[in-house]
Amino acid sequence: MCKWKIQFLDFCLEKKVLKFGKFQLKSGKCSPYYFNSGLFNTGNDLQKLGYFYAKTIIESNLDYKAIFGVAYKGIPIVISTAIALRKYFNINIPYCFNRKELKKHGEKGNFIGQKLTGKIILLDDVMTSGFSINDTINFIHSHANTKISGIIIALDRTRNINNKKNIQKNIEKKYNLKIFSIISILDIINYFKKKKHLHIYLKYII
C-alpha cells in the first residue's frame, strides 16, 4: 500500500470514521465494521479528504469533464475534491450534485451545480453491494445526457477479493466504466496485520 493510502487510513482511525462492532447496513445486512464519512466534519478534515479523492482521480487516469457527488454524503466530498483538484493539481473542474427531492421553485430540477453533459466521475463514500451505485447511475441517465466514465469511493468494503471482483466487474461491464477506491477492506486487513496494537480489530474483518 502506497504512502498516501496509509496516510488516509491513519486519518480515518484518528477521526474514528472506521468503527467496529455490529452495524446494520443500508442493504439490510449486518456488518462487523462501519465507515462513517460524516465524521469528517471540520474544515481541516474536508481539506484532507478532498486531497485523497483528488489524488485517487489523478491516479485513475480517467477521462472526465466534471465530478458528481451522490447526495447526501457525496455533497461535501465533491465540493472538497473540486477545491483540492484546483489547489494541489492545478485542475479547475466543475462539479454537480443531486437533490433527494425534486425542487419545483427557484432554480428547480434534480441537480445543483454544473449542467451534466459529457463525461463525469461519480464520487461517493463506500461500496458494499453495489445497489446504491446502480440506483444513482440509473437516476443520472434518466435525467441527463451524460457519460459516467468512472466511480471513486473512499472504501470498498466488499468482504473478500472474489466478491470485490464480481461486484465491480458487473457494474463496470454493465455501465462501461471503471471503479476506484482510496482504500479497500483488504488494505485495512494488511495494514492492521503490521500494527500490533491493531491486531484486536482483525477478528471483526477477517
Swiss-Prot record:
<feature type="binding site">
    <location>
        <position position="128"/>
    </location>
    <ligand>
        <name>orotate</name>
    </ligand>
</feature>
<feature type="binding site">
    <location>
        <position position="103"/>
    </location>
    <ligand>
        <name>5-phospho-alpha-D-ribose 1-diphosphate</name>
    </ligand>
</feature>
<feature type="binding site" description="in other chain">
    <location>
        <begin position="72"/>
        <end position="73"/>
    </location>
    <ligand>
        <name>5-phospho-alpha-D-ribose 1-diphosphate</name>
    </ligand>
</feature>
<feature type="binding site" description="in other chain">
    <location>
        <position position="26"/>
    </location>
    <ligand>
        <name>5-phospho-alpha-D-ribose 1-diphosphate</name>
    </ligand>
</feature>
<feature type="binding site">
    <location>
        <position position="99"/>
    </location>
    <ligand>
        <name>5-phospho-alpha-D-ribose 1-diphosphate</name>
    </ligand>
</feature>
<dbReference type="GO" id="GO:0000287">
    <property type="term" value="F:magnesium ion binding"/>
</dbReference>
<comment type="pathway">
    <text>Pyrimidine metabolism; UMP biosynthesis via de novo pathway; UMP from orotate: step 1/2.</text>
</comment>
<dbReference type="InterPro" id="IPR029057">
    <property type="entry name" value="PRTase-like"/>
</dbReference>
<keyword id="KW-0460">Magnesium</keyword>
<dbReference type="GO" id="GO:0004588">
    <property type="term" value="F:orotate phosphoribosyltransferase activity"/>
</dbReference>
<keyword id="KW-0328">Glycosyltransferase</keyword>
<feature type="binding site" description="in other chain">
    <location>
        <position position="100"/>
    </location>
    <ligand>
        <name>5-phospho-alpha-D-ribose 1-diphosphate</name>
    </ligand>
</feature>
<feature type="binding site" description="in other chain">
    <location>
        <begin position="124"/>
        <end position="132"/>
    </location>
    <ligand>
        <name>5-phospho-alpha-D-ribose 1-diphosphate</name>
    </ligand>
</feature>
<comment type="function">
    <text>Catalyzes the transfer of a ribosyl phosphate group from 5-phosphoribose 1-diphosphate to orotate, leading to the formation of orotidine monophosphate (OMP).</text>
</comment>
<protein>
    <recommendedName>
        <fullName>Orotate phosphoribosyltransferase</fullName>
        <ecNumber>2.4.2.10</ecNumber>
    </recommendedName>
</protein>
<comment type="subunit">
    <text>Homodimer.</text>
</comment>
<dbReference type="Pfam" id="PF00156">
    <property type="entry name" value="Pribosyltran"/>
</dbReference>
<comment type="similarity">
    <text>Belongs to the purine/pyrimidine phosphoribosyltransferase family. PyrE subfamily.</text>
</comment>
<dbReference type="GO" id="GO:0044205">
    <property type="term" value="P:'de novo' UMP biosynthetic process"/>
</dbReference>
<keyword id="KW-0808">Transferase</keyword>
<dbReference type="GO" id="GO:0046132">
    <property type="term" value="P:pyrimidine ribonucleoside biosynthetic process"/>
</dbReference>
<dbReference type="InterPro" id="IPR000836">
    <property type="entry name" value="PRibTrfase_dom"/>
</dbReference>
<dbReference type="GO" id="GO:0006207">
    <property type="term" value="P:'de novo' pyrimidine nucleobase biosynthetic process"/>
</dbReference>
<dbReference type="InterPro" id="IPR023031">
    <property type="entry name" value="OPRT"/>
</dbReference>
<keyword id="KW-0665">Pyrimidine biosynthesis</keyword>
<feature type="binding site">
    <location>
        <position position="157"/>
    </location>
    <ligand>
        <name>orotate</name>
    </ligand>
</feature>
<feature type="binding site">
    <location>
        <position position="105"/>
    </location>
    <ligand>
        <name>5-phospho-alpha-D-ribose 1-diphosphate</name>
    </ligand>
</feature>
<dbReference type="GO" id="GO:0005737">
    <property type="term" value="C:cytoplasm"/>
</dbReference>
<dbReference type="InterPro" id="IPR004467">
    <property type="entry name" value="Or_phspho_trans_dom"/>
</dbReference>
